[in-house]
């Protein structure tokens, strides 16, 4: 068997050089019978939920946001007076198919305006920044029934996927070159071992994705989420591919020049929405049973700052997309935007716990019981999962 594989794929603790010394970790792969798939997308930096999803019905909104409030006619109406910024217009298609949940006034359970602490809590699933180093996605792999496997579509390993379960990683970055003859010898070495051979072939399949994307000019730059979403879809639809994935995008810390319609944030949200639409299209028939969750570590201040942006806040917005959504809706217990209703008189007040949302998503996507969901999110037994979100 001759293999023309020039690029080096690396996964968590796994490289082709490590294969030669039997350093390959035990990576568990999904079978054709597994239908549940989850992609967790972390927007690092704290994106402005009030800009992304405007509560046009709130009488305080336009006075409060001033220069960062778009005209109502420029927004994409959803329901109950909530509307999307124009950049998120591609999500309207998900909405019309009953595949979109818009989450608002949502926050992690710990009050912080620190990126480091906020991301740590969101990725570990805990209620404080100190504690287990394991990520909640890795714990999910421990409680899921049947075969399962995880992958990070990122330059590094997100904390959400770290833990006792071995997972793979894929990045479009060039990680080195391996001679074809070396790969041929590795194939001969491992073809007699079913487990090692399967992992080796899966690694090469992930490498092929990178080569194909490079040939198409879609290397997955930070400014082009669509390329990474297409890669995620290709990896997850491969026979035996992963069914739990983590992705991340930075650049959401908009302290200055945030803009409104057509501005910096609106354009960045447009690239995200285009990527999500591309992912759905690339999944094909396997979109059925797939769920995508988009969250950020915190929202932004309700009032603009003096440099045309917003500062670190508390509650914000997020999204759940998937075929298993019960029905499209805006999920919130709206707290209001009057001064007395703001958290510490500056931020959108939190009324929705990220863990409650995620428990409901996991139950609907992987048929987890409440007890299993509590194992994914330790010390959260008092947080009721939103089981009604998914079918």
Put a short name on every predicted segment.
Residues 298-329:
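Histidine-centered active-site microenvironments of extracellular/periplasmic hydrolases
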């Amino acid at each position: 068997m001759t293999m023309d594989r020039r690029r080096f794929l690396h996964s968590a603790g796994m490289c082709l050089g490590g294969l030669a010394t039997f350093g390959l970790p035990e990576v568990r792969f999904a079978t054709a019978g597994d239908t549940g798939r989850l992609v967790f997308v972390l927007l690092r930096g704290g994106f402005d939920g009030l800009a992304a999803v405007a509560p046009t019905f709130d009488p305080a909104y336009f006075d409060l946001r001033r220069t960062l409030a778009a005209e109502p006619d420029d927004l994409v109406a959803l329901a109950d007076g909530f509307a999307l910024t124009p950049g998120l217009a591609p999500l309207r298609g998900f909405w019309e198919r009953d595949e979109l949940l818009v989450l608002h006034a949502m926050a992690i359970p710990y009050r912080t305006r620190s990126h480091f602490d906020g991301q740590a809590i969101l990725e570990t699933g805990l209620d404080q920044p100190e504690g287990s180093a394991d990520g909640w996605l890795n714990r999910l792999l421990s409680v899921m029934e049947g075969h399962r496997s995880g992958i990070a579509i990122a330059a590094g390993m997100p904390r959400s996927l770290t833990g006792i379960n071995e997972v793979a990683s894929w990045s479009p970055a060039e990680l080195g070159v391996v001679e074809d003859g070396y790969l041929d010898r590795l194939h001969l070495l491992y073809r007699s071992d079913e487990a090692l051979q399967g992992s080796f072939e899966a690694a090469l399949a992930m490498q092929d994705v990178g080569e194909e994307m490079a040939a198409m000019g879609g290397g997955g730059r930070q400014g082009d989420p669509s390329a990474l979403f297409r890669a995620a879809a290709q990896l997850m639809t491969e026979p035996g591919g992963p069914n739990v994935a983590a992705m991340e995008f930075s650049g959401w810390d908009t302290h200055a020049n945030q803009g409104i319609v057509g501005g910096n944030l609106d354009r960045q949200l447009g690239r995200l929405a285009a990527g999500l639409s591309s992912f759905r299209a690339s999944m094909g028939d396997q979109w059925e049973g797939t769920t995508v969750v988009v969250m950020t570590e915190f929202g932004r201040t309700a009032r603009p700052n003096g440099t045309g942006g917003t500062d670190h806040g508390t509650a914000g917005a997020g999204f759940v997309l998937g075929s298993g959504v019960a029905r499209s809706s805006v999920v919130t217990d709206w707290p209001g935007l009057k001064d007395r209703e703001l958290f510490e008189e500056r931020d959108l007040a939190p009324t929705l716990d990220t863990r409650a949302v995620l428990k409901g998503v996991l139950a609907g996507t992987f048929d987890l019981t409440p007890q299993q969901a509590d194992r994914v999110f330790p010390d959260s037994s008092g947080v009721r999962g939103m089981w009604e979100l998914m079918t």
